[in-house]
Amino acid sequence: LSRDPLAYVGKTPLTGNRAAVEMLKASDLVLDLMTLLFSAEQHEILEAGGRILLVVEPPEILVRMTPTEEDRTKVLTASARLRAAKTMTVTSSAGTDATFALGQYPILEEYGFVDKPGRWDHWPSGFLATWANEGTAQGKIVLAPGDILLPQKSYITSPITCHLENGYVKAIEGGFEAEHLRDYMESFNDPEVFAISHIGWGLQNRAHWAVMGFYDGEASIGMDPRACAGNFLWSTGPNNEAGGERDTACHIDIPMRNCTVKIDDETVVQDGKLTGDYA
């Protein structure tokens, strides 16, 4: 459907190329310039102890968000709290009110460098995520004008309401943009594209919400809005990178502004701003 590397995930030019896979498994560090995310080959390389660093953004974005030890400390501090949490609640003045049970899946800690065997990361980054327990995502998420759809790389202009039930998006309501999103997801002919995937929030102060609008759609994959400090980032589709069984090819990332995110009773994001030790 698209040349965007994240518009169809799981199968890559490396798929079925055993000689290349074995060579990469024997390597200490793999710089991924083609996006192996969600592929069986990536899992195999990581399980062999290889380190993978995904690097696909334009040079000026890489320079602006060159990872630092401070990024790592910030992500790991928030991760320790998320790891102990049992629930995540997200609300917004636009009408979002959703809950997710936690604990079944690991934490995704993205701080931009790979400092131990078997670790995957993405430069640039600076955010934290996990996956909701299977079947537990409930409520509704209301995308407001200015929120972003990826890989479409579009700022929406009118509200889109996603109704969550038992871990899936059961209905998508709104105007043309809601219809466009629904049509795109349905084109994969796979009910698993509507499953809730990772959920979390951005921690990177050097990421900027407005930057994506200055790039051609194929020049960037949109790491600025994914990592932007204080966003709520949620997604649909596969969870195989977390040890789950969903291997669908459609993965939608949706960074949102102006949300309040709570883990258990602690507010980590208030109206789109990081709070306390997370700021």
Where are these regions (language model features)?
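Active-site bordering "gate/hinge" segments
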Residues: 1-161, 165, 190, 260-279
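Short, acidic Gly/Pro/Ser/Thr-rich loop/turn segments
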Residues: 107, 148-150, 179, 206-208, ...
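Short intrinsically disordered coil segments
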Residues: 117, 215-216, 250
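Glycine-centered flexibility motif
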Residues: 123-128, 139-141, 197, 202-204, ...
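Active-site proximal loops enriched in glycine and acidic residues that flank catalytic Cys/His/Asp
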Residues: 143-145, 164-166, 173-176, 203, ...
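Short conserved micro-motifs at the rims of enzyme active sites and ligand-binding pockets
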Residues: 153-154, 210-213, 245-247, 273
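Dual-mode signal for accessory low-complexity, basic/Gly-rich regions
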Residues: 155, 171-236
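Internal helix-turn-beta structural module
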Residues: 219-270
